[in-house]
């Protein structure tokens, strides 16, 4: 049997990237992270860089805007995982061009890690970001690059500390805002589990040219259920303030960045139901907890305990 794939990360020091890099190294993959000199010398990244070094991660000097450095880095590996942030999504075409030239990549994971962008009903500004991700998918497919798209839905560490309250610094004390009627199911995943599931998919033929949906059964919940679970844990009832879609849309239009971004993403999930309003067909996707039943994921019930 062939050894484990060598993996190159672009955006590996970012929010979700660091969890996937760690999962890669811990799973025994030769793990490479493309970094600029400025990242290595950035004091805010020192601790993370040291942690990566302790895992045996190799840093490769390069830049998304330096074609030669990209091609050189890509030629050392089998798999490329992009976890670049919102501002760099469109510039992944540069990465795709380098992958195409290098000619050796067995799998490319573009920066997704959210909704399935081909199955959304979004309004601006979320719509623009989703459209960019969808355009990147089409370029990958047109170039014939083998791929896996990872749909993770909500990051638990982002959305659960404040019970998915837009813009709130912590959990609600007396009142809780619920977008829509509160009975639409959404998905929340722990970042470490996202890392584990993503790395499991790297060498798996079942995820080749497919979407990997991370939708474990105990991580699918409505806002009403989430609030009830929180009330049970804290022993304190909250007044529920329901915001109809018309008002949600108005709030999005009136809000500034980043509040409007967060609200528009929550709108797709909690009002439109875009996490759970379609069936996963074998022709285009697989569900992570079904294909990797041995992964012990953290259910929402357990994740919430750390915020009580």
Curated annotation (Swiss-Prot):
Residues at which NADP(+) binds: 11-17, 36, 45, 137
Primary location recorded for the protein, binned into one broad class: cytoplasm
Keywords on record: Cytoplasm, NADP, Oxidoreductase
Stretches assigned to coiled coil: none
Compartment list: Cytoplasm
Any single GO CC term annotated in Swiss-Prot or TrEMBL for this entry: cytoplasm
Record: active site: 133 (proton acceptor)
E.C. numbers: 1.3.1.-
GO terms of molecular function: oxidoreductase activity
Cysteine-cysteine disulfides: none
Family: Belongs to the NmrA-type oxidoreductase family. Isoflavone reductase subfamily.
Protein name, per record: Isoflavone reductase homolog
Provenance organism: Solanum tuberosum
């Amino acid at each position: 049997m062939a050894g484990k794939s060598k993996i190159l990360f672009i955006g590996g020091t970012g929010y979700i990237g660091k969890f996937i890099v760690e999962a890669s190294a811990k799973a025994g993959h030769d793990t490479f992270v493309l970094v600029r000199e400025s990242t290595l010398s950035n004091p805010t990244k020192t601790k993370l860089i040291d942690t990566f070094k302790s895992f045996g991660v190799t840093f490769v000097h390069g830049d998304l805007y330096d074609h030669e450095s990209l091609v050189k880095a890509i030629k050392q590996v089998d798999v490329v995982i992009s976890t670049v942030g919102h501002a760099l999504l469109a510039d992944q075409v540069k990465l795709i061009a380098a992958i195409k030239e290098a000619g050796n990549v067995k799998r490319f994971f573009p920066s997704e890690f959210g909704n399935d962008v081909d199955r959304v009903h979004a309004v601006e500004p979320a719509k623009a970001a989703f459209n960019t991700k969808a355009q990147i998918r089409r370029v990958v497919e047109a170039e014939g690059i083998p791929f896996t798209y990872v749909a993770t839905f909500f990051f638990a560490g982002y959305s659960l500390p404040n019970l998915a309250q837009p813009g709130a610094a912590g959990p609600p004390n007396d009142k809780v805002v619920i977008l829509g009627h509160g009975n639409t199911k959404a998905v929340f995943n722990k970042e470490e589990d996202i890392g584990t599931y993503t790395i499991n998919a790297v060498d798996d033929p079942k995820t080749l040219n497919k979407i990997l949906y991370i939708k474990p059964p105990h991580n699918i919940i409505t806002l009403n259920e989430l609030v009830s679970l929180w009330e049970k844990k804290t022993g304190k009832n909250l007044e529920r303030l329901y915001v109809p879609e018309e008002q949600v849309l108005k709030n999005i239009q009136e809000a500034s960045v980043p509040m409007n971004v967060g609200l528009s993403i929550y709108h797709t999930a909690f009002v439109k139901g875009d996490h759970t309003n379609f069936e996963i067909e074998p022709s285009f996707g697989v569900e992570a907890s079904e294909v990797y039943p041995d992964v012990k994921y953290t259910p929402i019930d357990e994740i919430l305990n750390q915020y009580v």
